[in-house]
Amino acid sequence: MDQWLEEIRAALPELVVYQQEPMKKHTTFRVGGPADLYVCPKKQELPVILGLAKKKGLAVTVIGNGSNLLVGDKGIRGLVIEVGAQMNAVEVQGNILRAQAGALLSQVAAKAAAAGLGGMEFAAGIPGSMGGAVTMNAGAYGGEMKDVIRQVTVLTPECEQKVLSREELDLSYRHSCIPKNHFLVLEAELSLTPAPEQEIRAKMAELREKRVEKQPLEYPSAGSTFKRPEGYFAGKLIMDAGLRGYAVGDAQVSEKHCGFVINRGNATAAEILQLMKDVQERVKKQSGVTLE
């Protein structure tokens, strides 16, 4: 690890490398132990960082905005790469919007609205970045990334850039081919639909109101904790199992929306995992449905 640090500092003297960085600072759950090494690189620095990590046998974990993510109390060994503020450029040409992987979905939706392009309204309130949204085919309120993606540029494990079409991405409910191939999203190209800016902003405001009304946005969480089982709603299954407000330490099933597990202040990853396990067991016993 020391040798990697030495070599990376020689190769990229401007790159800031944090050591023993608390991951709770970088997740929306506000939970997680320290990362051995932590960087937030520019796009052109990624191949150098990954190449050196591979050469030294250093484990690599890539994160985006830290939503939909639970980091253990002991943290993450090796190197954590945040695809974030150094990779968040967004540009519009005609009805095509290009966004780097670190661009926040709220930022992308706002840029699309300002250009009079509809299609990203559903994503305006999702607390994630473009890279994560593509990787898991993020969606809300009847929309998903699959509806708007034209193509995506990724970095392969061999540090080569590759362009994937929407078909090649194999997008389905909260799924893409990216994780199994160990690709790293660099940029997404979206095909959007011209619409009056006022209408787009009105739709975004309407969805924002729904979120504020129905979701526990006042507490740290990772968003919806469980996938929606086919034919059911996870939140209703949890509520029907009598688990509204159920808590383990400072981890709690939200009273506002049972599909969310929240951190009431000082929850640990162990408490959250135990809570999730308890919920899965109770729901399975009550309804026969397995929550993922």
Feature locations, PLM:
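Structural signature of FAD isoalloxazine-binding scaffolds in flavoprotein oxidoreductases
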Residues: 32-33, 38-44, 70-88, 135-166, ...
